[in-house]
């Protein structure tokens, strides 16, 4: 795949990273040469066939070069989340027989130094951003490392590259392991090359000979969504990848987007929600006229996007005017002036976020898949779109539903070239994942419309089965509460094996710019809500400590409204509590892509949950 791209795109810029305030760029030819140098150095350090190179660090050219070099050398790429504890790093490195670790900085190196003596296969560690403070045997800087393989000839490396087969493993993606040990999903060369070629085209990503796409890389590369979108698809179609700053998710991402003006952008739902909240905060602080203009422009755009087939000439004129006067300026301020495709994946997108961006004339194309399907198995795009749907299966892939209920909801099952090889060292788990006909079971619930568009409706494990045997999908209830109450950040329904439903709530608060941890200070939008309700509170603790009457009454009224629209009484929230701190990655309630970890929340707030059901 890389050789084909090299012939077509060799002179084009491939990777761009900020050094001393300036963008440093390398071409595809330079990228390929550096990857070969890395491969030779991995061989020199003793990388064994089908053993892994584990990479622990934020997205960077060094991450990409190490990953490609590991594959060239016949090894397996294994990404490790920078938020992992030393023990979690040990589990992955031990399980994948890591021979070499590539580590970003001293802080992450310290984690590895704690576990190195318990990793029998680990031969060397490469540090790529910081200089080495204390010398150790087999510890190298990236500059030293890239020179190690200079005496290995091209023919030796070419023999290894040419001996590799499409059905051999080249990438390991470790699932989060919310219900047990993390599972290493083995992805083959064929999985990676097929997905890079066909999923991206289904989303209308262009080859560089038509238009060179530019993207910003910022989501963790140890997650398949970012790795396939940023790294492998980038090689396939000659994209220019700009690397965001490590604090991208703490607020600097928009600065990078404004500078780069990408042609395509992917975010997980929480990223799109954060952008939405930031804009709502900015709107809350603006003057009366600006507020009214934005509200008018967004309502005109939303109506046009929801009823695009039946707009009169006059409505089309108002839409164009709204876009010219207001919306285009907002998209420019977000860094989306040139962005033609906005993707969302890794978790379901709620209606409020979808409609908010349609109001800005930004369509969010949803992707759906899992680590075990090399990322997107179904994808929306400009020519393949329905609201609330994650599109259709990509070429070479199929979807079916099993055990459908009366409303057409069934478990989503996958078949095709994206489907993984199995779990490393877990034959029993691999057998459990597939049925006797070779279909991979997702554990997700969905329905298909008459045209084959897939709609994900929930997760079987998340489905609440009450003490009375009633099935309750929690996400629609949670989304309804968040829509009704703009002060609420996270809402989680409780009720499995219980007599009634209850709910844990957190409030929207400002994040610490250095750590991304939630602070006690309410966001502008939340303070705005408090003022409207007659409360002077500016912090979460003020509201929780005093059970602020105005806010608690407003929350109860909001929940009453949601209950009024419930399918039946079983779907009604009977008790709730406001937690003193919002959910976060560091708090353990959210995963690396900001997905809610329901079991972890239940465990952490066991006392609060138990209090709902005490007789």
Which role does the model predict for each range below?
Residues 20, 107-166, 279-329:
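ANL superfamily adenylate-forming
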Residues 490-492, 556-615:
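Conserved C-terminal "lid"/linker of ANL adenylate-forming enzymes
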Residues 193-214, 221-329, 338:
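Conserved AMP-binding/adenylation subdomain of ANL enzymes
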Residues 10-13, 147-174, 181, 206-214:
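Conserved pre-ATP/AMP-binding loop-to-beta segment of ANL
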Residues 400-402, 406-466:
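Conserved ATP-binding/catalytic segment of the ANL
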Residues 2-26, 133, 577-583:
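AMP-dependent adenylate-forming
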Residues 11-68, 85-90, 141-149, 189:
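Conserved AMP-binding/adenylate-forming core of the ANL superfamily
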Residues 25-29, 170-197:
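Conserved AMP-binding A3 loop
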């Amino acid at each position: 795949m890389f050789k084909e791209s090299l012939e077509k795109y060799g002179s084009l810029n491939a990777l761009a990273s900020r050094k001393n305030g300036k963008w440093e760029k390398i071409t595809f030819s330079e990228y390929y040469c550096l990857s070969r140098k890395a491969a030779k150095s991995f061989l020199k350090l003793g990388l064994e066939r089908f053993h892994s190179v584990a990479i622990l660090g934020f997205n960077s050219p060094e991450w990409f070069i190490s990953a490609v070099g590991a594959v060239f050398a016949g090894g397996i790429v294994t990404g490790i989340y920078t938020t992992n504890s030393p023990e979690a790093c040990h589990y992955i490195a031990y399980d994948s027989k890591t021979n070499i670790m590539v580590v970003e900085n001293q802080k992450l190196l310290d984690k590895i130094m704690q576990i190195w003596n318990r990793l029998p296969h680990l031969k060397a560690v490469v540090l790529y951003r910081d200089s080495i403070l204390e010398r150790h045997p087999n510890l190298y800087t990236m500059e030293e490392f890239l020179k190690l393989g200079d005496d290995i000839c091209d023919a030796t490396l070419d023999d290894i590259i040419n001996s590799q087969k499409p059905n051999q493993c080249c990438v390991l993606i470790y699932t989060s392991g919310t219900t047990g040990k993390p599972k290493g999903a083995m992805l083959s060369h064929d999985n990676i090359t097929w997905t890079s070629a066909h999923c991206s085209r289904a989303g209308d990503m262009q080859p560089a000979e038509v238009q060179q796409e530019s993207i910003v890389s910022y989501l963790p590369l140890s997650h398949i969504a970012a790795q396939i979108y940023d790294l492998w698809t980038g090689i396939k179609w000659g994209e220019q990848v700009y690397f965001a700053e490590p604090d991208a998710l703490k607020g600097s991402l928009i600065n990078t987007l404004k500078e780069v003006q990408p042609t395509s952008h992917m975010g997980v739902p929480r990223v799109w929600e954060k952008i939405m909240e930031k804009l709502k905060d900015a709107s809350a602080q603006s003057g009366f006229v600006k507020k009214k203009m934005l509200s008018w422009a967004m309502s005109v755009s939303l109506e046009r996007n929801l009823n695009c087939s039946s707009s009169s000439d006059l409505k089309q004129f108002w839409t164009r005017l709204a876009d010219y006067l207001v919306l285009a300026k907002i998209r420019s301020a977000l860094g989306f002036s040139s962005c033609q495709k906005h993707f969302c994946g890794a978790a379901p997108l709620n209606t409020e976020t979808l409609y908010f961006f349609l109001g800005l004339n930004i369509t969010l194309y949803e992707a759906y898949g899992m680590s075990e399907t090399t990322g997107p198995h179904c994808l929306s795009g400009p020519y393949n779109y329905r609201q609330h749907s994650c599109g259709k299966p990509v070429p070479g892939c199929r979807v079916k539903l099993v055990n459908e209920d009366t409303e057409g909801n069934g478990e989503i099952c996958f078949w095709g070239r994206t489907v993984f090889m199995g779990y490393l060292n877990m034959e029993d788990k691999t057998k459990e994942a597939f049925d006797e006909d070779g279909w991979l079971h997702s554990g997700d619930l969905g329905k298909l419309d008459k045209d084959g568009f897939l709609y994900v409706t929930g997760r079987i494990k998340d489905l609440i089965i009450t003490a009375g045997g009633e099935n309750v999908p929690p996400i629609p209830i949670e989304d309804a509460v968040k829509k009704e109450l703009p002060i609420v950040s996270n809402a989680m329904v409780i009720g499995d094996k219980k007599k009634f439903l209850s709910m844990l709530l957190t409030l929207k608060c400002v994040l610490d710019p250095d750590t991304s941890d939630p602070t006690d200070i309410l966001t502008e939008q939340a303070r705005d809500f408090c003022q409207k309700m007659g409360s002077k509170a500016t912090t979460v603790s003020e509201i929780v400590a005093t059970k602020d009457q105005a806010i608690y009454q407003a929350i109860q009224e909001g929940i009453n409204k949601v209950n009024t629209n419930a399918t039946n009484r079983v779907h009604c929230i009977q008790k709730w509590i406001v937690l003193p701190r919002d959910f976060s990655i560091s708090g353990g309630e959210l995963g690396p892509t900001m997905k809610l970890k329901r079991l972890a929340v239940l465990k952490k707030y066991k006392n609060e949950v138990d209090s709902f059901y005490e007789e």
